């Protein structure tokens, strides 16, 4: 996150940002601001006085952004916006149970981009096609728009994008005589050299498929593909197997994390403890916004939460390298979509909130805080520092999970956590792939 003002990307990062915009979007489209007359398709009159609820997932939406939304919604409608934070761990269950319930549904909800196909095909969200152009149209992240579409109509739009990149301890790497690797093969070998009984060369949990899948993607593998009009799991594909075997070796040779640990908080492991004790990890991979939790301990805030200050002498970042020197590996494209519940009785107020969220000012606010904006016109507002460059460079080649109608069920049943965990425990990769292909095939098409 870049909290110290609006800065433009340096030439190298700007070139990456432009490429990212071209990769993820088409061109042209609309845009609006919270002030002024509501565009066609909105009902500003009907929104007056409506109190609405907005679910955000986890803590990624910063307090500054939440306060902005509450204030702007009050100004625009006179109504109250209640923002409720949901934990990612049980969000899927809550969405499944409450979206169909008119009395308990959120009016607007953030939703993981990988869950969007399931809920859109199930009819859980309102049709946003009439206001799509007003909210940004083709300037919005194309891959995120696609996962929220059904029959050419938009039901869930991008909220923000993130990407995962490597954070490393410069002091530990330099002491070992290691430089930033240029290929995935070099990375795997280097982090293995850094492992000790008390320190992971690369801290990654065995069940952490969202990061582990980068080794699959880097070797040309996929989790699933569409065959005709059906989706099929491709864990047994030769290229996928190559990536899974690399992950298995990496986990054994470089990580001390439990085989049962999933997508967690590895930044805790790369930091020194409060008392200065050595870190338990020399290298991690995490979403870009995690760097605000990495650094030297500088005390606690008024809520008792640790404050960390980045130290360039100790910490550094780089995109996970790919199999070809100089090219980043494809990583899992983090981020969220946003949608209006079809069961909400306050559609006008919900649309007004979306108008504020997709306004120029809010898109800039997201970028300032290190969250990739939904509207690619504002990618440059991410800044020009090392974090912005690593975010853009890693996002250039990032990939989403399959846009299959049953994908939310795959994630909800934690099939991939179980699969990757068994691989981390040393299981037969090919046999496990065949077993879990069958499990995924049974539910992936909804």
Region locations from a protein language model:
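Conserved C-terminal helix/tail region of periplasmic/extracytoplasmic solute-binding proteins
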Residues: 80, 174, 396-446
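Hinge/lid segment of periplasmic solute-binding proteins
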Residues: 41-46, 113-164, 215, 312-318
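A structural signal for short loop-to-beta-strand junctions that line the ligand-binding cleft
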Residues: 97-98, 105-107, 136-171, 201, ...
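Extracytoplasmic/periplasmic solute-binding protein
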Residues: 155-159, 164, 188-240
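Extracytoplasmic ligand-binding clamshell segments of periplasmic binding protein
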Residues: 223-300, 348, 432
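Short, solvent-exposed loop/beta-turn-alpha elements that line the ligand-binding surface or hinge
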Residues: 43-47, 129-140, 222-242, 249, ...
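C-terminal lobe and pocket-closing loops
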Residues: 290-311, 323-418
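Conserved N-terminal structural module of periplasmic/extracytoplasmic solute-binding proteins
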Residues: 2-117, 309, 324, 365, ...
């Amino acid at each position: 996150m870049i909290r110290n003002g609006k800065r433009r990307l340096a030439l190298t990062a700007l070139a990456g940002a432009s490429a990212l915009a071209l990769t993820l979007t088409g061109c042209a489209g609309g845009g609006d601001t919270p002030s002024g007359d509501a565009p066609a398709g909105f009902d500003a009159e009907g929104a007056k006085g409506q109190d609405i609820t907005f679910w955000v997932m986890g803590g990624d939406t910063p307090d500054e952004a939440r306060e902005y939304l509450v204030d702007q919604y009050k100004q625009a409608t006179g109504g109250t916006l209640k923002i409720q934070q949901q934990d990612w761990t049980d969000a899927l269950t809550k969405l499944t149970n409450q979206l169909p319930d008119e009395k308990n549904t959120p009016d607007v909800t953030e939703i993981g981009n990988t869950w969007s196909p399931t809920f859109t095909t199930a009819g859980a969200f309102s049709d946003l096609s009439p206001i799509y152009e007003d909210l940004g149209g083709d300037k919005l992240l194309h891959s995120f728009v696609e996962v929220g579409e059904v029959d050419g109509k938009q039901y869930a739009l991008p909220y923000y994008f993130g990407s995962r990149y490597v954070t490393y301890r410069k002091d530990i790497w330099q002491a070992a005589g290691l430089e930033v690797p240029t290929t995935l093969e070099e990375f795997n070998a280097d982090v293995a050299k850094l492992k000790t009984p008390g320190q992971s060369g690369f801290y990654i949990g065995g069940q952490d498929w969202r990061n582990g899948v980068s080794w699959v993607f880097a070797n040309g593998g996929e989790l699933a593909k569409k065959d005709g009009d059906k989706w099929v799991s491709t864990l047994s594909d030769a290229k996928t197997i190559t990536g899974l075997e690399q992950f298995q070796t990496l986990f054994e040779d470089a990580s001390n994390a439990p085989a049962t640990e999933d997508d967690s908080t590895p930044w805790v492991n790369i930091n020194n403890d409060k008392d200065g004790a050595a870190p338990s990890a020399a290298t991690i991979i995490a979403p870009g916004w995690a760097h605000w939790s990495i650094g030297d301990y500088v005390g606690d805030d008024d809520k008792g939460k640790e404050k960390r200050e980045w130290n360039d002498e100790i910490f550094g970042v780089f995109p996970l390298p790919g199999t070809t020197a100089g090219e980043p590996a494809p990583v899992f494209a983090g981020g969220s979509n946003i949608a209006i519940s079809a069961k909400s009785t306050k559609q006008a107020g919900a649309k007004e909130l979306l108008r504020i969220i997709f306004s120029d000012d809010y898109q800039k606010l997201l970028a300032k805080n290190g969250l990739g904006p939904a509207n690619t016109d504002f990618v440059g507002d991410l800044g020009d520092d090392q974090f912005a460059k690593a975010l853009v460079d890693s996002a250039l080649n990032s990939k989403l999970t399959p846009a299959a109608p049953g994908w939310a069920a795959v994630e909800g049943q934690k099939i991939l956590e179980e699969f990757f965990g068994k691989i981390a425990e040393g299981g037969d990769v090919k046999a496990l792939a065949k077993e879990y292909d069958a499990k995924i095939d049974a539910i992936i098409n909804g």
